[in-house]
């Protein structure tokens, strides 16, 4: 299942951090492909879905636009194709999870040391010290242990996406750096309805329920039935 979530975050919490504006979240999701054949001018199914939802929400008319996702290349391919002027941000907690997993691989017998090492990397990440962070990872790439592969993957993941990890600058700009709203949408719109005990779904059936859930959670349920009624009368 692929999910597109749109929200605004002009509100601030007590510490001045951006929080989503109440009632601003909308969802659109389905089991469909995000892949586009090489040299094809036809957008993928999911790209078209994203374009419909962003058009509906007038995303491109906003003063500032941001695309938040994990490090998956297909997300950034869609973002670059559809919204070349949007700021791209890798979810900060995804990056920290990668660093935490690496810390455990580097110090499997010493959880306290792993936690300390990870926290030092977190601080470098949050403070915008990406060069220092990459420098701290580099020596472990040359080791002969199994953790060298993990270190190499983490290093290249951060290096490849470093322009999307300028979290100090993003915070100064008042931008969200977490995709928590998207993660919550995956749970509320998808998992709690489709992943109950004993359930089995066809793609057609699951997509129908997903569409219905997204309509309800996006506050478009009544609009959906009104449009359906108009189409039936026109037919």
What is the role of each PLM region?
Residues 1-235:
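Catalytic center-proximal scaffold of phosphoryl-transfer enzymes
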